[in-house]
Amino acid sequence: IFFFCLMASLYSQARPISYPEGFTLMSHSDIYKDSVYFHYSPSFKYSVGLEIAKDDYFDDEYSFFRFTYLLNRKNTQNSQSNLYFQLGLDPENFDRHFYGLHGDWETRRWFVGFGYKESFNDIEDFSEKYLQFGIAPYLGKYGDLHTWLMIKTKKNSLGDSWSTYPVIKFFKGDFLIELGYNNKTRTDAHLMYRF
């Protein structure tokens, strides 16, 4: 059970850190930007990588060197929690950078996650925050297709209010897909593949 809980938690979020010496390719798309992020994890404690983004809000394209560090992980017999620090720096414009925290707690059945990020650029600084709650409608075995039904609420300070919407997440093996939608924020999509 402990091993499955550990594996489930590794896949429940688009993982900012992979297995030691592992690689991860992630893609994210929402109303503000589309991005692709590739990272390498020298250890389970941190990852380094490159994100390439097409910013729809500022009509710009840029990249970030990224660093993510696992501040805390707590495993119990029935749950796991993680807290991460993240940092990004544009190599062509040091005024464009970000930092933030995100974390999660989960069992095989329940999930709670949060994130907060401060972003800086030449045009307008902004913050992003979210809360996410989920339930697994069934408990699969290791290697099965797993499903999370979730509610996500998020706010970008460039917008005017919180947006809350349903999200469905599937993962199997080293592949994860997460899709959410509402008429305010449109599509919120995450893809991940680890190798």
Which stretches of residues belong to each language-model region?
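Cleavable N-terminal export/targeting peptides
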Residues: 1-18
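Transmembrane beta-barrel domains of bacterial outer-membrane proteins
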Residues: 13-151, 163, 167-195
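Short, glycine/charged-rich beta-strand-loop motifs at protein surfaces that mediate ligand recognition
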Residues: 151-157
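Active-site-adjacent loop/helix micro-motif of nuclease/hydrolase catalytic cores
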Residues: 159-161
